Amino acid sequence: MGWYFLLAAAGLDLLLPFLLAPFYPGYSHRRQVMSVLGSPESPVRWVYRVWLVALGLLLCAATPDLWAAFGNRSPVLTGLLIAVLCVFALGAGVLAGLFSVNADKAVETAASRIHGVGSVLGFLALAFAPLLVALLAFRDGAGGAGVFSLICFALDVCCF
């Protein structure tokens, strides 16, 4: 069941901003971060904020299946991968959903600081997921998946 949670979380997280943007006049994917969809000024704020909390919960709910699939092969790497996923889920998901940013960056509140710190820590942790997946893949003899994951990690580092 956890694999379905992962697929649902990834798919909806990619689609939802594009589905919500038309309902927020003036919102631009090019000029604004997705978090603005959850700002107090946004007409779709509740949908987006509830989604972020649900995203975090879905990702955390997927971790038992990750452990079942890889924990017996490499408990340390699997534990690190689960930790990285949970830090992202709680920081960029749950905390970001509970505490909103303002549409105007000049206005800083305690909520926007919590949102920012949670998101930064979450995405920083998630940046290491492809490296951990690569190590797990190489350990299992899946060289192609390992190389692909290393390429993703390299792109991640270059673009972060």
Where are the regions a protein language model picked out?
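Hydrophobic, aromatic-enriched alpha-helical segments typical of multi-pass transmembrane helices
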Residues: M1-Y27, V33, L37, E41-F160
